[in-house]
């Protein structure tokens, strides 16, 4: 198999895992693009991205332009004379002149089965919608948002136990394997691109903290999907006793209830059962303000009086 001279562009840990796979391969990473250092932590100290840290540790030249729209940045990239540019969660828009610069163009690893869940939060939205499977798509980039021709797809079933955290880990393992497979096909000229079906496309909007508020007027199944989608961020929550209480883990109960949505039906070490518009949601792990996440048995030991049966939890509209 031919080795390729690669520019890698990415920023978070998810991207760094793909860079590590390239460094372990026969390909040559000749330059790394990543976001400028950002203030982080309580001291707001300028902090390098995980991708930059990995590149520096491996003595690879690092480029951190604030934009790739200006000619000097574009000329610097062209001077690297790369065969291909691999983009994984980079965070900057690539103008057409950049997309056309490498001999084989630019490819992207995206955490969904395109054209479903284009955009910023594909892992979370797949859980939020109750999808049964997700996966990774390697695509040839164009000027649209995740609209390029698909080069390779790998599939992953979504388990009932999955959260965004666990799916992230699974896709962070699957993505690098798919990337190396796609690069092999591109280097050998054996990979056929497939157009995306626009009729099947939808958009994975970024999550917001406001969206994580549990609305008991939804079904138990939808709320269960949201709890999993919003773990580990921003974490589903409800307001009660003047406090914001986060819900880290829940499941749909087999209990049947005609109580008003938001009514606590039972509270035991097995969970706190809450009536919804359709079905009952059992809360299993929660977090009180200023505390770490705890299982419900420990929560009830500390604040059992808050969760007495027939207590009504406030709804979003109330």
Curated annotation (Swiss-Prot):
What does the UniProt keyword field contain? Protein biosynthesis, Transferase
Q: What does this protein do?
A: Attaches a formyl group to the free amino group of methionyl-tRNA(fMet). The formyl group appears to play a dual role in the initiator identity of N-formylmethionyl-tRNA by promoting its recognition by IF2 and preventing the misappropriation of this tRNA by the elongation apparatus.
**Binding positions for (6S)-5,6,7,8-tetrahydrofolate?**
112-115
Q: Which GO terms describe its cellular component?
A: cytosol
Give the protein family: Belongs to the Fmt family.
Organism, as annotated:
Shewanella sp. (strain W3-18-1)
Spell out the disulfide connections: none
- Give the encoding gene's name: fmt
Source organism phylogeny: Bacteria, Pseudomonadati, Pseudomonadota, Gammaproteobacteria, Alteromonadales
Q: Which CDD domains match?
A: FMT_core_Met-tRNA-FMT_N, Met_tRNA_FMT_C
Task: List, alphabetically, the Pfam families matched.
Answer: Formyl_trans_C, Formyl_trans_N
Catalyses: L-methionyl-tRNA(fMet) + (6R)-10-formyltetrahydrofolate = N-formyl-L-methionyl-tRNA(fMet) + (6S)-5,6,7,8-tetrahydrofolate + H(+)
Q: Where are the transmembrane segments?
A: none
InterPro entries, A to Z: Fmt, Formyl_trans_C, Formyl_trans_C_sf, Formyl_transf_N, Formyl_transf_N_sf, Formyl_transferase-like_C_sf, GART_AS, Met-tRNA-FMT_C
- The name of this protein is Methionyl-tRNA formyltransferase
Q: EC no.?
A: 2.1.2.9
Which class of enzymes does this protein belong to?
transferase
Q: Name one GO molecular function term.
A: methionyl-tRNA formyltransferase activity
